[in-house]
Amino acid sequence: MSKIISIATGVPGYKHSQSDLFSYADEVYNKNEQDSRKLGFLYRQSGIEYRHSVMADFSIPEEERTFFSTTAIEESEPDIGKRMEIFNEFAAPLSVETIEKCIDGKINKQEITHLITVSCTGMSAPGLDLQVMEMMDLPRTIVRTSVNFMGCYAAIHAIKIADAFCNSSPDANIIVVCTEFCTLHFQKEFSVDNLTSSLLFADGCAALLMQGDKAGKGLRLENFYSDVLFKGKKDMSWEISNNGFLMTLSGYIPELIKADFEKLVSSALQKTGRKKEDVTNWCIHPGGKKILQSIAESLQLQKEDFLCSYEVLNDFGNMSSPTILFVLQKIMNELEENKVKEAVIFGAAFGPGLTMETFTATYD
């Protein structure tokens, strides 16, 4: 077994209100007054108040924009190369800043033995892992792993890899860092998929420190469980194009997850000899308000059971892979502040496939 010792989060410098983001999207997608009203309704009902971006363009006048310099559909969009230039310039500094917060007071950076980087919004070689190593002056012999292009559930997959490292190297100090710049891939072409992406996705970073089971107080990981709903493989996808990464996100996803989620939870908890009633805290990836509502209905739970997920959605939007770690950080902070002695946490995130990835953990 292994433990999550600490989690830190970070966001890029530009904080945009959902109302400003609606105004920007309305410039791009508005065909007529009726379309504008529909778009405004969707933004208001999103459950999101703020989102962060690596770019200022979404809430400044058009003449001041530097990347998405015009909303005119006839003008060409930034190509994939320009988008990756932004990622390569800003992803590593944000990752390093977040890692340093994560290990502060826990370990010295020279004690880091493993580094796992996670992203589905930017890739290159040398990549984020080597950029972080160089900026932090980490040992060149460090064990590196990159989890790329897996989407919103990738953080759990990375934690699963880190858990395996801890089991084989009990004295390991493992850093997992998830860094996503989803707003880099804004698309001007009007489609349901582009519209949905424009109202949900944001930028963010999260880092965690994992150690072996002999470590001090932390979150002990008990079990991982995953399932794939191939019937939903066309409903959620993430593909590379000349003009950035393209998201497919259908309205059927909440119902697909709802239909199978109770069974998923039962199967996952059965591996640890637990039942749904044993879970004290639910760490659910806030992929969208409807997804959280559908899961609550499937498990016969209330909105109050997912408050940390709703708060992250409200304050940050869906940042893809780091999002569930924002939720988990909130849960861990609340447990510590309330001096809770024991807790059982069930976590779940979803992504292309349609993949459902889960973990079960205890806090003691």
List PLM regions with ranges.
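Structural motif
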Residues: 116, 175-177, 208-210, 283, ...
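Condensing-enzyme catalytic core mediating Claisen C-C bond formation in acyl metabolism
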Residues: 1-86, 173, 182, 186-255, ...
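Claisen-condensing/thiolase-fold acyl-transfer catalytic domains that form or cleave C-C bonds
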Residues: 96, 120-121, 139-141, 146-167, ...
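A short glycine/serine-rich beta->alpha loop
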Residues: 81-87, 117, 144-148, 193-196, ...
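Active-site-adjacent elements of ketosynthase-type condensing enzymes
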Residues: 124-130, 176-196, 225-242, 289-297, ...
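Conserved beta-ketoacyl condensing-enzyme motif
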Residues: 42, 46-137, 276-292
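Short, well-ordered amphipathic alpha-helical segments that serve as non-catalytic structural scaffolds
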Residues: 44, 48, 90-104, 205, ...
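Short coil/turn connectors at secondary-structure junctions
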Residues: 1-2, 109-113, 140-143, 168-174, ...
